[in-house]
Amino acid sequence: GLGDETPPDYLTSVSDGSFYGWPYCYWGKTVDDRVPQDPAMVARALTPDYALGGHTASLGLCWVPAGMLPGFDVDGMAIGQHGSWNRSTLSGYKVVFVPFANGRPAGPPRDILSGFLAPDESVSYGRPVGVVVGPDRKSLLVADDVGDVIWRVAGAR
């Protein structure tokens, strides 16, 4: 990698024919000089909409409608962050919520589910990967490929 925070995992809109930089550049037109360059491709590169942090391994995501979970009163994305292994201080190992407004990310992420990593980073109790809205439409189901379980996250009954 290029460092602990670079390049960040990201959330972005996708449109047919668009180019997001790989392998020539990242986060817009930031050139990666470790690879042979193609200036025409770098010029076409779009900047992603929202940074999720470096090496968080943000793998699974789903749309969460406003009010589905207590305290989350706007629409947004729930994102399973599988967690890093290749940085000096580990990151990820949780499920975050990114609020949306007008169809775009609009605010800092909030933790939905955390505690999968020991404070001293010596033990991973779980690594969230897949995230879906439960069949009851009032909960999230989170696949954990370390604990080999599916967590159900819902408000108090």
Write out the residue ranges for each language-model feature.
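Blade-level signature of beta-propeller repeat domains, shared across WD40, Kelch, NHL, RCC1
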Residues: 132-157
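Beta-propeller domain segments
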Residues: 1-113, 118-126, 133, 155-156
